[in-house]
Swiss-Prot record:
It is a multi-pass membrane protein. The chain crosses the membrane at residues 274-294, 301-321. It is found in: Cell inner membrane. The keyword Transport applies. It comes from Klebsiella pneumoniae subsp. pneumoniae (strain ATCC 700721 / MGH 78578). NCBIfam families: PRK09546.1. PANTHER family: CORA FAMILY METAL ION TRANSPORTER (EUROFUNG) (PTHR46494), ZINC TRANSPORT PROTEIN ZNTB (PTHR46494:SF3). The gene is zntB. Belongs to the CorA metal ion transporter (MIT) (TC 1.A.35) family. GO terms for molecular function: cobalt ion binding; cobalt ion transmembrane transporter activity; magnesium ion binding; magnesium ion transmembrane transporter activity; zinc ion transmembrane transporter activity. The keyword Cell membrane applies. Keywords: Cell inner membrane, Cell membrane, Ion transport, Membrane, Transmembrane, Transmembrane helix, Transport, Zinc. This is Zinc transport protein ZntB.
C-alpha cells in the first residue's frame, strides 16, 4: 500500500489524531508525517461534528461502504473483513450500576496496516486506558497490538461492571434471607441491566473470536492468541451473566412469596381481632337497640358492670383462641 501524507488526515474538529511511534508511544499528527505500516495513524472522530462528517463522506482513503458504516446508526457488535482491512463495531460500558441500562456506547472503527479510524458519538471511557498507556510510552506499537489493547480494555470494563452487578445480587440475596424486600423497581432494573449486557456482549465475544481466527496481515500469531484469550474471558463473563439472570428469577419468586406471606399474616391478624371483638360488638348493639330501655340504666353501677362484662367476654374469647393455638 502507498504511504499516506499527514495532511490528508488533518481534520479541524477531530477528537485527536496520533501517530504511533512504534515504541509504545504516540505523537500528534503533523502535515509532513508519512503514515505507513511501521508508524500507523490513529484518527478518532465524533461523526456528528460537521468537519468529521464531511471528511468521512468524501475521503478516498476509505472504501464507500466503510464511510457509510463509520457514520451510520448504532448496530450490534460485528466485524467485516474488507481486503486487508477490517470494519469493526464494538460496545463499551460507560455507566454505573445505578443508571438505567441505555444501549451501550458504540464505537465503530476501520483499520488496516497504515490507518486506524475510530468514530463515536458518546465518549468511550475504555479508550482512556489505552491513551494513558500510549502517552506514558507503554502502549501498543502497531495496529495489531492496538486492536488487542482496545479489546482488552473494553473487556476489563465489561468484567468490572458484571462483577458489580454480581455483588449487588449477593447483597440482595442476603437481605432476602433477613426478610428485607428491596424497593420497588430495584430488581427489575438489575435484571434489565443483565439482559442488555447479554444482548450486546454475546456478539462482541463472537467478534473477538472472529478476529482471533482471521489471518489479517497486520496481526501476528501472538496477537491472535491474545485476542482468543480475551474472547474466552468475555465468555466467562457471559456465563456469569446467565447465572445472575437465573438468580434474579429465583429472587423474584422469593420476593413474591415474602409479600404473600406478609399479606397473609396481616389478614390473619385482622381476622383474629374481628373474632375477639365480635361478641362485644354484638352485646353493645343489642343493648343499644333495646326498645324497652337499656337494662340497668337507672342503676348507678349498671355501666361499670356492663364494661366489666365486656372485658370478661373479650378475655374469654382471647383465652379460647390461645388455647386453640390460633394466637
Amino acid at each position: 500500500m502507498d504511504a499516506i501524507k499527514g495532511s490528508e488526515l488533518q481534520i479541524p474538529d477531530a477528537i485527536f489524531a496520533w501517530v504511533l511511534d512504534g515504541q509504545g508511544g504516540v505523537k500528534p499528527l503533523a502535515d509532513d508525517d508519512i503514515i505507513d505500516k511501521d508508524k500507523p495513524c490513529w484518527l478518532h472522530l465524533n461523526y456528528t461534528h460537521s468537519d468529521s462528517a464531511d471528511w468521512l463522506a468524501a475521503t478516498p482513503l476509505l472504501p464507500n461502504n466503510v464511510r457509510d458504516a463509520l457514520a451510520g446508526e448504532s448496530t450490534r457488535p460485528r466485524v467485516t473483513r474488507i481486503g486487508d482491512g477490517a470494519l469493526i463495531t464494538l460496545r463499551c460500558i460507560n455507566g454505573s450500576t445505578d443508571e438505567r441500562p441505555d444501549q451501550l456506547v458504540a464505537m465503530r472503527l476501520y483499520m488496516d496496516e497504515r490507518l486506524i479510524v475510530s468514530t463515536r458519538q458518546r465518549k468511550v471511557l475504555a479508550l482512556d486506558d489505552v491513551l494513558g498507556d500510549l502517552k506514558e510510552g507503554n502502549g501498543p506499537t502497531d495496529g495489531g497490538s492496538w486492536l488487542v489493547e482496545v479489546c482488552d480494555a473494553l473487556t476489563d470494563h465489561a468484567s468490572e461492571f458484571i462483577e458489580q452487578l454480581h455483588d449487588r445480587i449477593i447483597d440482595l440475596e442476603d437481605d432476602l434471607l433477613d426478610q428485607q424486600v428491596p424497593p420497588r423497581g430495584f430488581l427489575a432494573l438489575l435484571r434489565k441491566q443483565l439482559i442488555v449486557m447479554r444482548r450486546y456482549m454475546a456478539p462482541q465475544r463472537d467478534v473477538y473470536a472472529r478476529l482471533a481466527s482471521e489471518r489479517l496481515p497486520w496481526m501476528s500469531d501472538d496477537q491472535r492468541r491474545r485476542m482468543q484469550d480475551i474472547a474466552e474471558r468475555l465468555g466467562r463473563g457471559l456465563d456469569e451473566i446467565d447465572s445472575c439472570i437465573a438468580r434474579t428469577a429465583i429472587m423474584s419468586d422469593e420476593i413474591a412469596q415474602i409479600m404473600q406471606e406478609s399479606l397473609a399474616r396481616r389478614t390473619y391478624t385482622m381476622s383474629l381481632m374481628a373474632m375477639v371483638f365480635l361478641p362485644s360488638t354484638f352485646l353493645t348493639g343489642l343493648f343499644g337497640v333495646n326498645l324497652g330501655g337499656i337494662p340497668g340504666n337507672s342503676w348507678h353501677l349498671g355501666f361499670s358492670l356492663f364494661c366489666l362484662m365486656l372485658v370478661v367476654v373479650i378475655g374469654g374469647v382471647a383465652w379460647w383462641l390461645h388455647r386453640s393455638k390460633w394466637l
